[in-house]
Amino acid sequence: MERRTLTFVEACQHLGNMYGIKWDEKEPTPEELAARFEREQLFRANDFAAEFFRDQYKLSEAAQKYAQERWSDAIIEEWGIGYAPHKNALLRHAKDKKANIDDLIKAGLIKVSGEDGHYYDAFIGRLMFPIRNRTGNLVGFSGRIINPKKNAEGREPAKYINTSETPIFKKGETLFGYFEAQRIAARRDLLNIVEGQPDVIRLASIDQQNTVAPMGTALTSKQIDLVKKIVSKVVLIGDNDPAGQTAIVDH
């Protein structure tokens, strides 16, 4: 039996087309149109940043060294892995290209200082993993620090940070790799759930494309609902250390 990963509305439209039933979609309200327009703006902002991060990856020896020690060049390109450099490079690039800074702020890519209102990049010195929703739209990023340096207070930056929550990205409703995994997972009726983005990509490179990861938190009910839409069997794979085993138990 063939499975399709469709939303309810998409499923109704698909069945209507199959059996010649006319599907009358109601006119959207002004509020719905405004929300749809905002979502499209955020998708475009993420696409703009993703292209920049990919270009910067090709210019960074440190980013390439880190990534190539873990994955092949083909896998790096397939997953759109990029690099966010220092010195507010994305902000400067956006100004040079006359991109909409407000959209980049709304997308969580540019931050505004609460002290003096100056703008700065949300991701600095990080390998960038694009995050897609179930239909393939780019909704955010997860950034992995590659050369951690302690701040003035002696603390190292977080190993991973994700895009802050936006109208198109909710951490507790998103699984990294879900878009890439859903068709193969549905066909195999099996989904691997691992701890982090590198684990997803590593397993996908050895024919385990049916692999996802939560966004740094324990699995939520909405993430579990996503899993149940496509499979009935799940394998939980933790890192081979006490913290990893505990994380999987929490999940």
Question: Each PLM stretch: what is its role?
Answer:
Residues 1-107, 111, 126, 138, ...:
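Non-catalytic accessory segments of DNA primases and related replication-initiation nucleases
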Residues 31-37, 44-46, 87-234, 247-248:
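Phosphate-handling DNA/RNA-contact segment within nucleic-acid enzymes
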Residues 235-239:
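Short beta-alpha connecting loops at secondary-structure transitions
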Residues 240-250:
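Phosphate/diphosphate-binding loops
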